[in-house]
Amino acid sequence: YDSFVINELRGYCALSSGDNGTAIRAYETNLGSQYASNKGARVKALMQLHYNNRNYPRAIEYGRQAQKGGFADGDVNTLLAQSYYQQGDFKATRAFTADLISQAERRGQAPRQNYLQLNLNSCIKLKDTACETAGFEKLVTYYPNPEGWASLMQSMLKGGPDVTLLNSFRLASEVGALSRGSDYTELAQLALERGLPGEAASVMETAFARKVFTEQRDIDRNTRLLNSAKSRIAADKAGLAAADRAAAAGASAEDDLRVAQAYMSYGQHAQAVVAAERAVKKGNGKTPGEAQLVLGLAQFKAGNKPAAVKAFKAVKGDPSLERVAKLWSLRAQ
């Protein structure tokens, strides 16, 4: 008993003076003592001390001991995941945090943010793009802050079919995640290619208002793009009602989709909903799921978020577009 008391005092004094090494030796000596009460708290304290000393293998040993003993709480699990990560074992970090995330979801709870962040960081270290994107999606699902959205959207703006890219850029614009001048330029060009000068002009006006172009050559080039879009707006607006009637009478969903998006670009969201609903009903668009996605956008812009979520969730047939629709659904909720 005397040795136990001496080690307790030695450990306390060592901790008070910042001598973690001596404290660890004293408390480890006492861990198996018959006089040591509250073993769970002692194991957790030793785990923390080893972590603070950057002895991650030993911290992991105590973390696993806590798990086997049934006294691993959220703080222990977080420290164990951090120990795996700091040790450079990113596969173990990813697997461990993925399990913790799944457990929380099965209980109907939001996973801890640090579990999600460590899982995402591991995916990035492992250069697993699919895992990285899924990690960002989880973050914005449970903790939808601007930084998470910005990181997610930058991972989405790396190519793909034009329809997917256009709607990814639209979402990035919606959440304030367009950070580079080239992002605005590409969104405007994609809109123009789809016959949407109103949207293209609006995008470029926002870009200039935010002063995202700093080089004179970029300013000149994008001024020409803005002027090109503006020069088409008058004719586009003048012919929109006739185009709407022709699309309604025709058999092609593509015409309805163009009209719906044109109406949206001019703030006429009720008309956009009607045209998009026609496209959905016809069901013969070139890209599977695009009509439902455009309908969701129109409903979202019209302020009918429940209808927008329903439409986004109905997007099927194109995996890349389904992913974008899922993110739009998260935004609309």
For each feature predicted by the language model, list its residue ranges.
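Structural motif corresponding to the intra-repeat A-B loop/turn of tetratricopeptide repeats
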Residues: 17, 53, 87, 126-127, ...
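Residue at a conserved register position within TPR or TPR-like alpha-solenoid repeats
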Residues: 14, 50, 84, 123, ...
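TPR-adjacent "capping" and linker segments in tetratricopeptide-repeat scaffold/adaptor proteins
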Residues: 35, 172-179, 229-253, 284
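C-terminal soluble interaction/assembly domains
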Residues: 251-333
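Alpha-helical repeat scaffolds
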Residues: 20-31, 56-68, 91-104, 127-141, ...
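Long, contiguous interaction/recruitment modules in multidomain scaffold/adaptor proteins
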Residues: 180-183, 189-237
